Amino acid sequence: MITPYNILRHELIGLDVEITQSTNKSLVGLKGKIVYETRNTINIERFDNSKEVMIPKDIAVFKFKLNEEYIEVIGELLMGRPEDRLKRKIKNIYPY
């Protein structure tokens, strides 16, 4: 089960997400469902028009919906291949 404490080591595909901050202002407020993830990007299928958008992880802050609560994660913490991120030991530097 995904919790705010293990989200960095969990599969992200299928989660609802919103971009809350980004260096690219046109991405802020984008909402959708994660459909694909690579080492440096996350692909989101938008809720409003079902188009797929590729978001670089290092320029954004993501707000994930977990059950009925929300958690914000800095995109740089998600960098790396998904299968390697699941194995990587993560320091407890991110306050929840």
Swiss-Prot record:
Keyword Acyltransferase recorded: no
Gene3D superfamilies noted in UniProt: Ribonuclease P/MRP, subunit p29
Subcellular location: Cytoplasm
Gene Ontology molecular function terms on file: ribonuclease P activity; ribonuclease P RNA binding
Cited Pfam families: RNase_P-MRP_p29
Subunit and interaction comment: Consists of a catalytic RNA component and at least 4-5 protein subunits.
Family that this chain belongs to: Belongs to the eukaryotic/archaeal RNase P protein component 1 family.
Protein purpose: Part of ribonuclease P, a protein complex that generates mature tRNA molecules by cleaving their 5'-ends.
Official protein name in the record: Ribonuclease P protein component 1
Gene: rnp1
